[in-house]
Amino acid sequence: MSAIVLEQADRLFHEHVTPAVQADADRSVWPTDLWRAVEEAGLTLALVPEHAGGFGLPPDDALRVIRRSAWAAAPIPLAETMVAAGLWSLTGGDVPEGSLTLGPVNQADAITAERRAGGWRLDGRVRRIPWGSAAGNVLLHAVSTDGEPLVALVPSDTLDWASRRNLADEPRDRLSLSGLDVRWDAVHPAPAACRDGFLPLGALIRSQQMVGALERALDHALLHAGERRQFGRSLSKFQAVQHMLAEAAGHFAAATAAADLAAAEWSAAGGLEAGAEAVAELAFPIAVAKARTGEAAGIVAAIVHQVHGAMGFTQEHPLHYSTRRLWSWRDEFGGESHWQAEIGRLVCSRGGAALWERLAT
């Protein structure tokens, strides 16, 4: 099943993620045909159980699809839609058609929810929501005045947005909520997977995406080094270039191992259906994955651009579709320093013996 789904996804991205589509996306043109193909393939509902009308894909397979979409630099909120749809279905809500996103995406932002007659009132300000107003609906994490974690699904066209973009020219809009009234059935208790917010889940999907983009960037560099000739021989024959590529490959391998471990443990715990105890145990591998992939992103992006020289900085060369995403994704849902500090906090709270057991098993 896994191989079939990945093969289907690869074919889809190869057919629909063209240079023209990517260039149009940089100019804020929504890739209608690509999104339609993704929806028709059922990929947007990959993490929605079959009994709820979804695909019910195993969690690790869903993450592999996310990784492949990042390899292709698909300019769509597939990862965000997968996770938001899966979480909303767990609350018993009906998953709407179209693209989804989620927020807040950092610890500094928060939304409060006050119960009102016939519904809820939401207040707060959220920065840099992925895809923001371009998505059809937004899954918002909020905390009630009683301290209960909640999720609310709100149509994006009813919200007050300020347009922003990241380095990859993807929408990262700012949302202002000032007494927004929503119906009672648009708000549900948050599943265990996101009771404390979306930061860990976001870090998990960004780590998978960065591995995909790292692989594509390294593919570009290896191809260029093999084809480009200087002083009568290919760049790959020069020892200095070989050392740079070896360094990049080493960081890619370490980042992949960290992301693979987080994906495997998340899948074994039940994915989005993981209970509170399992979610707490997943904090460590997710922190390691996000910190290590973020570190690799900066190093590998610098190396592959050095290998390409001036050619790699041109708009016409596809390398920037991978590296601009790497530079953006490494800072989203917590950068390296945040997750390195989280690793330290977890180690100190559990003691050295627990760390050794964690590393040795």
What would you call each of these model-derived segments?
Residues 125-159, 164:
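A short core secondary-structure module
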Residues 46, 95-108, 140:
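A short, Trp-centered hydrophobic/proline-enriched beta-strand micro-motif
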Residues 172-202:
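A short, charged helix-loop
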Residues 1-70, 200-361:
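Alpha-helical interface subdomain recognition
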Residues 56-65, 100-109, 181:
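Structural signature of FAD isoalloxazine-binding scaffolds in flavoprotein oxidoreductases
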Residues 113, 158-165, 181-188:
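Short secondary-structure junctions
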Residues 110-121:
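Cytochrome P450 C-terminal beta-domain/meander region
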Residues 24, 74-91:
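N-terminal glycine-rich flavin-associated loop
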